């Protein structure tokens, strides 16, 4: 025996009972009574109508035994080494005091600044040297030379 479920109220529909409504998009709705069909056609929300199964579920009615809450597994952070830094190095850096950390950071920034400055000076000197060796710039057209007329060789 196939027992259907009411599309609106969620009630059971036994064989030989209820009506079918087929919408324009060919979706089939089954209704237990004209009452639920009427409310469906009025576009009422079954969660707001007190006697429907959806309302009872939504408002937690009729649940006798309290179901124990599902326990979610807590994620535990695990320290792992990263490429280029071992676990000991990471732990050591984490345990540094903020003042020491700031001093190290400033020192590194200063060293980077000096390196950048030296690099820029070297690049500038290199550019000046290359500019001195290249006396006059020649365009690509000049480098190719004047157009050479091909002599006829047929005679």
Curated annotation (Swiss-Prot):
A GO cellular component annotation in the UniProt record: cytosolic large ribosomal subunit
GO biological process: cytoplasmic translation
Feature: compositional bias, Basic and acidic residues: 97-129
PROSITE patterns per the UniProt record, alphabetical: RIBOSOMAL_L24E
Superkingdom as given in the UniProt entry: Eukaryota
Region (Disordered): 97-155
Keywords per UniProt: Ribonucleoprotein, Ribosomal protein
CDD domains: Ribosomal_L24e_L24 (cd00472)
Keyword DNA repair: no
Bias (Polar residues) ranges: 133-142
UniProt KW Ribosomal protein keyword: yes
One MF term in the entry's GO annotations: mRNA binding
Family according to the record: Belongs to the eukaryotic ribosomal protein eL24 family.
PANTHER family: 60S RIBOSOMAL PROTEIN L24, RIBOSOMAL PROTEIN L24
Name of the protein in its database record: Large ribosomal subunit protein eL24
Gene symbol of the encoding locus: RPL24
